[in-house]
């Protein structure tokens, strides 16, 4: 477990020797607008590291790794992880390859889960029961740590097989383009004046009703960001309709 600035710096220096790493995060997002980082997992083929954000004050070594284009970063279904990295560090992993995207271009389901991927490639059935536990509580349990480590331990070896398979299929350039598009989309910030578009059936409203909803949705999103509170904890969607 990496719990100090010195330990993080030492880890990141060692990681620079490797061409690729697997990354994952554990976070909590129940009442907050922004995800609350609970743990970062990293595997470079030699070192499995669990990085405890509660003990780190200097993130510059990890930021340097995230932006180091000589090190490919692999994630699986990493859209939410990218949001965590962007909100916490102001950085996105570069370059990034998402194994769920690779798998989709090889004919797997679009939302192919990590456990299903691991079972197909290794025959191991992962226990995912820890996924919804409290990652902000300390100390983390042994089962939580084992669960978190497995997410990167299995990911990195599988990436090699998936890269070969995707290249053989002729879809690798398209898959890499899709990974870049995912990063671009994650950097797009929803403008408060467009928040009404995320409200179910808003298109059915009449002109004056829609104008009112647009103002309310704008205000709700601004308040949610200002107070770091999930939008439905500011005002529930059904209550917007009643107004």
Where are the regions a protein language model picked out?
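DEDD superfamily 3′-5′ metal-dependent exonuclease/proofreading module
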Residues: 1-243
């Amino acid at each position: 477990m990496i719990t100090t600035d010195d330990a993080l710096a030492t880890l990141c220096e060692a990681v620079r020797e490797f061409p690729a790493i697997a990354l994952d995060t554990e976070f909590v997002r129940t009442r907050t607008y922004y995800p609350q980082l609970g743990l970062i997992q990293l595997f470079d083929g030699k070192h499995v590291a669990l990085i405890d954000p509660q003990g780190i004050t200097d993130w510059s070594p990890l930021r340097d790794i995230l932006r180091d284009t000589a090190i490919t970063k692999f994630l699986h279904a990493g859209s939410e992880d990218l949001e965590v990295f962007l909100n916490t560090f102001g950085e996105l992993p570069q370059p990034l390859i998402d194994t769920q995207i690779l798998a989709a271009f090889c004919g797997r389901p679009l939302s192919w889960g990590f456990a299903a991927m691991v079972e197909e490639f290794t025959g191991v059935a992962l226990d995912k029961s820890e996924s919804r536990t409290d990652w902000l509580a300390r100390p983390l349990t042994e089962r939580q740590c084992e669960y978190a480590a497995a997410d990167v331990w299995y990911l990195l070896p599988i990436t090699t097989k998936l890269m070969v398979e995707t290249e053989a299929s002729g879809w690798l350039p398209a898959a890499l383009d899709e990974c870049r598009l995912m990063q671009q989309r994650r950097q797009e910030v929803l403008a408060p004046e467009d928040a009404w578009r995320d409200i179910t059936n808003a298109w059915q409203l009449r002109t004056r009703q829609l104008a009112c909803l647009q103002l309310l949705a704008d205000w709700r999103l601004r308040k949610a960001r200002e107070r770091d509170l999930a939008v439905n904890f500011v005002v529930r969607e059904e209550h917007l309709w009643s107004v």
